[in-house]
């Protein structure tokens, strides 16, 4: 029969409970979520219904270029074409004189100064409180999370066998206790050595009840118990790697282009007005607002030296502006249109490598993404430029705690798990069978000190103590680490328009930029009212002959015009030299024959006779057919700048243009001078309290400390000195966006910033198609110069935004400056040298031709074969100056019509007197590129206009309409912190924040120092007498002390 030792008493008893099994390994991480299915390709767009005429629809994108037709056959020389249409306005003229400074704005009201809170004096030390009545033991708190299993104690040294105590008096039999739960069977202990049988001693007297002996040697450990309950989930694993990106969906098909609306009908040409009286010099006009600085144009070819202009009258000295009071700060205005793309900024230095972030919670396996909805009909968009690298996304919210997975099949042994949670004590084993009384041994010597007892259990939580007095305010701690970027705040209300401020100093001229790429041709704008003709300019000299260009493609067929009135008979030209034989072209249709010229004798050319007096101007003929577009020659020399004409009354404001595309980020300018401190604004409203963070997983249970001895009440100490600043706190979760504070008052204007360094010239892009001249928008009032803020942090280069929808075409602007001198035509084939003839007689003035009937719009005819070159006609007489037309009111912008075929070259109209200048309208939206029109004939150089009188100072213009907000830019990278600003006044105390959610449990702290040994508890009250036990077995017969003796007890 084997006996096991009770560990506590050293007495043979039942088997000890096995130690709880080790914590199970952490479950394997869930599989990564599958990538979402790619979205189905968008269905092809439906064909839009035909647009109703009259509604202003946005201009459609430019259509693909048509296929190049087969090369035409060389036609025969055609007749000289009519003068082409008026060319596009030339490059912008010279910079106008600077406008007079605007009236300074009114001074704003001074903001409310925040009051600095005074530091309170340290309070007097509190009186010593009386010892409170010891509270009753509270109800045990909820069971905490399982603690980590403590380290296994080292087995103590086996104690020496204690002296056997005297047998105590037999106690009364106790009540039988309830049967305990069955204990786990331990391994059978090793058999003990059988004691020797000692000599029978004499019966001793009953001794005093013996004290309990020292603990005996620890029995052999039982067999390992059954595996303990599975350990709690381990610490959350590291953040899983991002799954593979889903397959991008196929791009949507480009929808079919809707059919073009019906073309507008051509208006009936108006009748020519009677010649007006020569205009007088107008009254001195107010100077217009200073125009925006235009972009530097490409340098043109140097033109011939112009004639010296007349000395202008000296301007009147401007009046000194009144010192204005600072205007009230208006509410923020609408977001202005995005600027043009600037040059790419310089590459910034690489940022510091970020430290490893904290491990995120264990993610849950993602569900497979749903199939994307079929894309709607795709709009036919303009092919965008490739987007830049996207900004880093904001960190997502922490994933929810994953559910405990079902037990899987036994896998391979995983990595060593973290210490498991301390298991609950196993069920109490059954009381073993009563051991047999051992033989009485001799008294043993004192045993060595036994191992330290186990730590006592922590008592229930006591009632909360009274609140202590408030301590002194601690020193401000060092600044904590940079917090996470908060969520974007809500947009504030739009501000009032600021008062016009004084103009800043003139900046340095930037380096001339490289000419940008050729833009797409804009849609042809609506035809404005006819402007009054300008005075005729002087005739320019003949430019150098340009090189012969290649043959241009045939233009689309135009409607045939009605026959024009026959021109005057031309003078016979000299015979040209023999030209090279050209390829034989197809026979052209016979053109209408002109008046036969007087055939001159092929003789040597005589001296030119005097020009006869001009005859009366004939009525303008009907529009003739346009010839094939000629090859453009080289650009002629640029003419001298014309004198500034008189300023007309301002025209009505145009419609606002569509916002332009986002410009490339410009190069970083020099750091501006620090601005002056603005007046303190009113205290902002307190932001809402941050939401509670998610509760973290329960931390492991710390090691149970020993119960310390209760200390006496301490005396009240003096208030301690100010402690050192604490370590910086950890970053809190970003709170929700705070409400917008009340707008602060405007600070005084800061000193002007230093001029920025001239930007580096950009890379030359491909030349784009020239668009129609946009109309200049009405200048908005100049805002007050704000104080320069601290140096901002450089953001990442934003991706280029998509082009906005084209806006409505703007109203027609005022006539542009004098255009660049047209290119010289290519030289004609050299004719044969004729014989020199005698000088011809002076011709008589020609007769006035009869006025032709106004032609009607004909149907477009097919392209005719080019006719032969006719004889050059004589130069016609210069027409009379027409009367100035009344400035027409700008009409409402009509819907952009479909791109029509290239129009025929019309006859060059007579130059009318200069009409009144209209107010610059807003910039028109960019239209689709129109077809290239035929090249017009070189116009005559008008006479130089007289110098206009300096106008009066103009009134400030109305504020422009706010532009639509541009697209939101990408989030820039966190830049370097700016210089610390001056410390502001202490604001009022905000309301106390709500209690935050319980934070994540911290890691297991190191075991605390061993507590002092507790004082011996008070002696317990004597227990109730037990119930008499069952009678014991009869004792062994004792030695007989005589007849009839009784056995000794």
From Swiss-Prot:
What keywords does the record list, in alphabetical order?
A: Collagen, Disulfide bond, Extracellular matrix, Glycoprotein, Hydroxylation, Repeat, Secreted
Q: Which domain of life is it from?
A: Eukaryota
Q: Where is this region: Nonhelical region (C-terminal)?
A: 1041-1049
Q: Where is the composition biased (Basic and acidic residues)?
A: 110-121, 667-679
**PTM comment, free text:** Prolines at the third position of the tripeptide repeating unit (G-X-Y) are hydroxylated in some or all of the chains.
Entry-listed glycosylation sites: 107, 950
Compositional bias annotation for Pro residues: 22-32, 82-94, 890-899, 1025-1037
Q: Where is this region: Disordered?
A: 1-1049
Q: Where in the cell is it found?
A: Secreted, Extracellular space, Extracellular matrix
- Composition-biased stretches, type Low complexity, lie in 34-46, 95-106, 155-166, 199-223, 244-257, 361-371, 482-497, 562-572, 754-779, 790-799, 913-926, 967-977
Quaternary structure per UniProt? Trimers of identical alpha 1(III) chains. The chains are linked to each other by interchain disulfide bonds. Trimers are also cross-linked via hydroxylysines. Interacts with ADGRG1.
Q: What does this protein do?
A: Collagen type III occurs in most soft connective tissues along with type I collagen. Involved in regulation of cortical development. Is the major ligand of ADGRG1 in the developing brain and binding to ADGRG1 inhibits neuronal migration and activates the RhoA pathway by coupling ADGRG1 to GNA13 and possibly GNA12.
Q: What is the protein named?
A: Collagen alpha-1(III) chain
The record's gene field reads COL3A1
């Amino acid at each position: 029969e084997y006996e096991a030792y009770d560990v506590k008493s050293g007495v043979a008893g039942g088997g000890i409970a096995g130690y709880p099994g080790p914590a199970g390994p952490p479950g394997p991480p869930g599989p990564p979520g599958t990538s979402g299915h790619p979205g189905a390709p968008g269905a092809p767009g439906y064909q839009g219904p035909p647009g109703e005429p009259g509604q202003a629809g946005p201009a459609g994108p430019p259509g693909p270029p048509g296929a190049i037709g087969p090369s035409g056959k060389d036609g025969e020389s055609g007749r000289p074409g009519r003068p082409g249409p008026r060319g596009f306005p030339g490059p912008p003229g010279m910079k106008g004189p600077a406008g007079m400074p605007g009236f300074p704005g009114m001074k704003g009201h001074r903001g409310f100064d925040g009051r600095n809170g005074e530091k309170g004096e340290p309070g007097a030390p509190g009186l010593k409180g009386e010892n409170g009545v010891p509270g009753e033991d509270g109800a045990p708190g909820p069971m905490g999370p399982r603690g980590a299993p403590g380290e296994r104690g080292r087995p103590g040294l086996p104690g020496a066998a204690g002296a056997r105590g005297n047998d105590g008096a037999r106690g009364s039999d106790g009540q039988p206790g309830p049967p305990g739960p069955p204990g786990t069977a331990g391994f059978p202990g090793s058999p003990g050595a059988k004691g020797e049988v000692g000599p029978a001693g004499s019966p001793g007297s009953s001794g005093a009840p013996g004290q309990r002996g020292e603990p005996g040697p620890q029995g052999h450990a039982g067999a390992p118990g059954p595996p303990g309950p599975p350990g709690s989930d381990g610490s959350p694993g590291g953040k899983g790697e991002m799954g593979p990106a889903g397959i991008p969906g196929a791009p949507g098909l480009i929808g079919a282009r809707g059919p073009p609306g019906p073309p507008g009908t051509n208006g009936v040409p108006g009748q020519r007005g009677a010649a007006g009286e020569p205009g007088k010099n107008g009254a001195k006009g107010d100077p217009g607002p200073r125009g925006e600085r235009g972009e530097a144009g490409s340098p043109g070819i140097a033109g011939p030296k112009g004639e010296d202009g007349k000395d202008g009258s000296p301007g009147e000295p401007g009046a000194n502006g009144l010192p204005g009071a600072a205007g009230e700060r208006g509410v923020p205005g609408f977001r202005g249109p995005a600027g043009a793309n600037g040059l790419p900024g310089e590459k910034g230095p690489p940022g510091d490598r970020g430290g490893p972030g904290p491990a995120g919670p264990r993610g849950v396996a993602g569900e497979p993404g749903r199939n994307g909805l079929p894309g709607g009909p795709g709009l036919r968009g303009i092919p965008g430029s490739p987007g830049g690298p996207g900004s880093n996304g904001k960190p997502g919210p922490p994933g929810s705690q994953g559910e405990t997975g079902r037990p899987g099949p036994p896998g391979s042994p995983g990595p060593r798990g973290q210490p498991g949670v301390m298991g609950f004590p196993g069920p109490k084993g059954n009381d073993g069978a009563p051991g047999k009384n051992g033989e009485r041994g001799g008294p043993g010597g004192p045993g060595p000190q036994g191992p330290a007892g186990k730590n006592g259990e922590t008592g229930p939580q006591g009632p909360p103590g009274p609140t202590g007095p408030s301590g002194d305010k601690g020193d401000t701690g060092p600044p904590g680490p940079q917090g996470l970027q908060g969520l974007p705040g809500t947009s504030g209300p739009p501000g009032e328009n600021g008062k016009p401020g004084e103009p800043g100093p003139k900046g340095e001229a930037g380096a001339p930029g490289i000419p940008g790429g050729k833009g797409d041709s804009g849609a042809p704008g609506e035809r404005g009212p006819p402007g009054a003709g300008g005075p005729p300019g002087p005739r320019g000299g003949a430019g150098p002959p340009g090189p012969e260009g290649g043959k241009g493609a045939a233009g689309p067929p135009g409607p045939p015009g009605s026959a024009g009135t026959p021109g005057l008979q031309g003078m016979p030209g000299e015979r040209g030299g023999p030209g090279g034989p050209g390829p034989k072209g197809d026979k052209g249709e016979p053109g209408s024959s002109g008046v036969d010229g007087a055939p001159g004798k092929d003789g040597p050319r005589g001296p030119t006779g005097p020009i006869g007096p001009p005859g009366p101007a004939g009525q303008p003929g009907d529009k003739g057919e346009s010839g094939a577009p000629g090859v453009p020659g080289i650009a002629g020399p640029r003419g001298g700048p014309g004198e500034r004409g008189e300023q007309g009354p301002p025209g009505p404001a145009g419609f606002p243009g569509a916002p332009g595309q986002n410009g490339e980020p410009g190069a970083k300018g020099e750091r501006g001078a620090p601005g002056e401190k603005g007046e303190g604004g009113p205290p902002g409203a307190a932001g809402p309290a941050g939401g509670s963070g998610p509760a973290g997983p329960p931390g492991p249970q710390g090691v149970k400390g020993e119960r310390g001895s209760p200390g006496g009440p301490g005396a009240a100490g003096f208030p301690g000195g100010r402690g050192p600043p604490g370590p910086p706190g950890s970053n809190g979760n970003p709170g929700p966006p705070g409400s917008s504070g009340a707008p602060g008052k405007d600070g005084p204007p800061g000193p002007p910033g230093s001029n920025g360094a001239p930007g580096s010239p950009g890379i030359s892009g491909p030349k784009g198609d020239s668009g129609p001249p946009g109309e200049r928008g009405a200048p908005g009032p100049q805002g007050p110069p704000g104080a320069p803020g601290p140096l901002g942090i450089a953001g990442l280069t934003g991706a280029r935004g998509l082009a906005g929808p084209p806006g409505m075409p703007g109203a027609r602007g005022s006539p542009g400056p004098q255009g660049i001198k047209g290119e010289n035509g290519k030289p004609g084939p050299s004719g044969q040298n004729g014989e020199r003839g005698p000088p011809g007689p002076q011709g008589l003035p020609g007769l006035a031709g009869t006025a032709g009937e106004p032609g009607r719009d004909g149907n477009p005819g097919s392209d005719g074969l080019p006719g032969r070159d006719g004889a050059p006609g004589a130069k016609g007489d210069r027409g009379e100056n027409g009367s100035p037309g009344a400035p027409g009111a700008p009409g409402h912008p009509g819907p952009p019509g479909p791109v029509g075929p290239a129009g025929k070259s019309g006859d060059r109209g007579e130059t009318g007197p200069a009409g009144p200048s209209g107010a610059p309208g807003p910039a028109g939206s960019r239209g689709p590129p129109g077809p290239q029109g035929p090249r017009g004939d070189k116009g005559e150089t008008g006479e130089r206009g007289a110098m206009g009188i300096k106008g009066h100072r103009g009134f400030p213009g109305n504020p422009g309409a706010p532009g639509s907000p541009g697209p939101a830019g990408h989030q820039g990278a966190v830049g370097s912190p700016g210089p610390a600003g001056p410390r502001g006044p202490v604001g009022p105390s905000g309301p106390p924040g709500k209690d935050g959610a319980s934070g994540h449990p911290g890691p297991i702290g190191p075991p605390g120092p061993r507590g002092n040994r507790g004082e011996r508890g008070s002696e317990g009250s004597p227990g109730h007498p037990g119930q008499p036990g069952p009678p014991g077995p009869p004792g062994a017969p004792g030695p007989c002390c005589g007849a009839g003796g009784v056995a000794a007890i």
